[in-house]
UniProtKB/Swiss-Prot annotation:
NCBIfam families: DVU0298_fam
Record-linked SUPFAM superfamilies: ARM repeat
Species classification: Archaea, Methanobacteriati, Methanobacteriota, Archaeoglobi, Archaeoglobales
InterPro entries in alphabetical order: ARM-type_fold (IPR016024), DVU0298-like (IPR054701)
Full protein name: Uncharacterized protein AF_0829
Length: 183
């Protein structure tokens, strides 16, 4: 299936998909397709799908929000604080928020709460290897010195699946961090 051929309203359905790679890919295409006032409406809609009231929790919504936002910075400016604050919501797939912060780093850099401080706080709180991988990715893109994190987790044997921009890579957290350190 070619996601590029789908309308944005259909692409959103793939943000619910059990295949994680499809979630990432659909979010990227959604970000490229949705522009202007439509971007604002889609971001609002995706935030709605993260709330209890919607009754239709969308696991990939943070990915969609970030991709639409990074392609529509003038629109995302009004949502960046709320987006970074999603890290405090335990019901949200926070590794996707961390990834999205990295993808939209130029826009969220000056958000409140401070994304660097919030990501570091959540690494301590969450402790999940996948979250740590995406958080370190985001911290590095934000320009933070992650050498302390790399040193701390360099011997981790935990296996993570990490989206590298084209595919899901299954590797040890320590091996992934070696790559991050070399970038």
């Amino acid at each position: 299936m070619n996601l590029e051929e789908l309308k944005p309203s259909k692409l959103i359905t793939f943000l619910y998909h059990p295949d994680e790679l499809l979630r990432f890919k659909a979010a990227e295409v959604l970000g490229r397709k949705v522009k202007g006032e439509g971007a604002r409406n889609f971001i609002l809609r995706l935030f709605w799908h993260l709330s209890d009231e919607s009754g239709a929790y969308c696991i990939g919504a943070p990915l969609g929000i970030a991709e639409i936002g990074r392609n529509n910075p003038e629109v995302f400016e009004g949502f960046k604080n709320k987006y970074v604050s999603l890290l405090d919501d335990w019901e949200v797939e926070r590794k996707y928020v961390a990834y999205g912060i990295g993808r939209a780093a130029e826009i969220v850099r000056d958000a409140y709460p401070n994304p660097v401080e919030k990501l570091r706080e959540k690494v301590e709180e969450i402790g999940d290897a996948s979250f740590i991988a995406y958080a370190i990715f985001a911290l590095k893109v934000l320009g933070d010195d992650v050498s302390d994190m790399i040193a701390r987790f360099r011997k981790s044997e935990e296996i993570v699946e990490f989206y590298d921009g084209s595919e899901m890579v299954r590797t040890k957290l320590s091996d992934l961090l070696v790559e991050v350190a070399e970038d």
